[in-house]
Amino acid sequence: MRAGQRVQESIMNVHASALAEAHLPDEQTTAFAREAIEDLSQQPKKLSPKYFYDATGSELFEAITRLPEYYPTRTELAILKERGSEIAKIIPENAALVEFGAGATTKVRLLLNQSRFAAYVPVDISGDFLQAQANGLKRDFPSLGIYPVAADFTTPFELPKAVASMPKVGFFPGSTIGNFEPHEAQAFLRSARQILGKGAQMIIGADLEKEERLLHAAYNDAAGVTARFNLNVLVRINRELGGNFDLSAFTHGAIYNHDRHRIEMHLISRKNQTVRLLGTSFSFRPGESIHTENSYKYSLDRFAALAQGAGWRVRESWTDSAKMFSVHALEAAE
């Protein structure tokens, strides 16, 4: 065993001991703590973007989607409205619509109004937010079977038995696929294909490459909503895990990495500081950052290759006239 491996194992053993002594309330909180400690122990430091999303984080993200600088949501909505009848034609009747990472219901309502779905399965890590959205849909679609699943959609989960015999159509709108590293995106698409089963289809959004000034504005909005969203992961660590991050000592920053075709979001330390979390100390230099999220931007060809590598075929692709955003209909390659 190499010396570096021994040091890493020693560090992880210390962290495991700290977690055992913390008496955290449930498995989800323990998983959050484990990932946070491991990720902050790396160089460069990072935190998983999935932990942006408690009820506050979900509300902040929905606020981001309404910002004038943030083009993806309104552009995708326009595509779904304009191409809704074409999308409906390729969806089997009486199918179950499974939305991975369900948020606000604006987009899914467009699909539900255009197509004759028998059931809707929203899947999201934020259970309270999920249930509230499901209740609103139930009032407007009383004949639709709605079966919320509180789960991390990036890991395997079981669909409700009520939809077992129905054709399955996955729905993954927004630019969330871009938040994964390319190999993680393929792993997610393979997992989704397995969860949805034989004959699966999927409607998925992907942000497209464009001028850097548009990207910079979208992720560094003038109102500072994206900054509050980014900082929410530290708010959660303080509240749920007993951390002592000084929020005023970190600033939000988003940059475009040309070589890797992605926006990178960071929380940047303003000063020399030390933060404690469950018995572990983390030191920061001025300008040192925590890398919190990536948002990869695709060409149509690169996205098609990504999907093909995960066992899907692109049946149809749609874009807006300015080619800012894309929506793809995928079908499982048998």
What function would you assign to each model-found segment?
Residues 7, 11-51, 58:
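N-terminal auxiliary segments of SAM/dcSAM-dependent transferases
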Residues 126-127:
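Conserved SAM/SAH-binding beta-strand->alpha-helix loop
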Residues 94-103:
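Conserved class I S-adenosyl-L-methionine
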Residues 104-116:
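Conserved SAM-binding loop of SAM-dependent methyltransferases across substrates and taxa
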Residues 195-209:
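Conserved beta-strand signature within the Rossmann-like core of class I S-adenosyl-L-methionine
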Residues 214-296, 300, 304-310:
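Substrate-binding/catalytic lobe of Class I Rossmann-like enzymes that use SAM or dcSAM, i.e.
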Residues 45-54, 59-91:
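Class I SAM-dependent methyltransferase Rossmann-like catalytic core
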Residues 186-198:
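A short glycine-rich, Lys/Arg-flanked "PGG" loop and its adjoining helix->strand segment in the class I
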